[in-house]
Amino acid sequence: MMRFLPLSWVKRTGMLAAVAAGLLIAGTLGAAADPITLGSASTYGLLLGTNETLTANGFHVGGDLGLSASDKVNLSGYLTVSGNAYIDGTPSVSGGGSYSVSGSIVTQSMTAIDAAANSASINAGALTANLSVAGNAISVNSSTNSIVIKAITNASENVLTISSLSLTNGSITFDDNGYTNAKFIVNVTGAFSMTNAALIKGINGASGDDIIFNIEGTGTTVNLNGNSSTSLLGTILAPQRNVNLGGGGNLTGALIAGVKNAGTSYTVNQSGSGYNITSLGFTPRSSGGNVPEPSSIALFGAGVSALIAARRRRKR
């Protein structure tokens, strides 16, 4: 038999349903995914995976140097390290150059550190892109050309996934765009080169510790052969690539290469005229959840007010 409920009960039920809806909408925003982090690999200006060969010919590394098991060092010129050198085992050293380490030389396993860097690459590559560029690639090859990448959030990473990146004599600018401590992830699945007078800069708060260039998979050699005008920002993360660099360029960030080694011997080849890495490795964003949008907050407040009013009428 159908029951007819009192109108007062129906009104209260409807109001409580509206309140519940307000609570649900405010709650569906949820928390952002865990931030991308390099973990124990974050202090390294230069980190090489196992069985890798480093050729240095006027190479300065700011921060720490990490050499993994079975690595080889060919000193064609000098290699200087302003932090500590962490070495897994005894690397093979050849050539007539020299090296100096301002801090300590520490022997330790690098396995977990390499794994942390590789995990960062995998996690970054799994992010859904929320930025885009025409043609799904960046090609800036003239000093009169430039591209600006603007942040759209600081509650999660600003992610751009492209098929290739070629920067020659032009510039890429990262813009925090009014957000505080925005983070940028640029996933590159194909060729990657920043050569000649390539320039990467940050404005409105963006800096080298906010940017990762995540060069995914196996493929062509990462080309960082510049000149004295080359100035780059960010952590260059290339777990399965060879890297060439030189020509007097400067990277404010870090270079991490070969940390996903499945039997391949990768190389980092620094040619003449020097190269300088000033350590400012990637720092993760805050792990706090998303801030609800003002409309959601207003709806939540309205729901609470309605609930209070309903209870007062009920008491009467």
Identify the meaning behind each predicted range.
Residues 1-4, 301-303:
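Compositionally biased, intrinsically disordered low-complexity regions used as flexible
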Residues 2-7, 285-288:
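N-terminal leader/signal peptides at the extreme start of proteins
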Residues 4-17:
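Bacterial N-terminal signal peptides that target proteins for export
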Residues 14-26:
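Bacterial N-terminal signal peptides
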Residues 32-288:
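Primarily marks folded extracellular/lumenal domains of secretory and cell-surface proteins
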Residues 292-310:
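A short, hydrophobic C-terminal helix/tail in secreted or cell-surface proteins
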Residues 313-316:
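Short, charged juxtamembrane terminal tails flanking transmembrane helices
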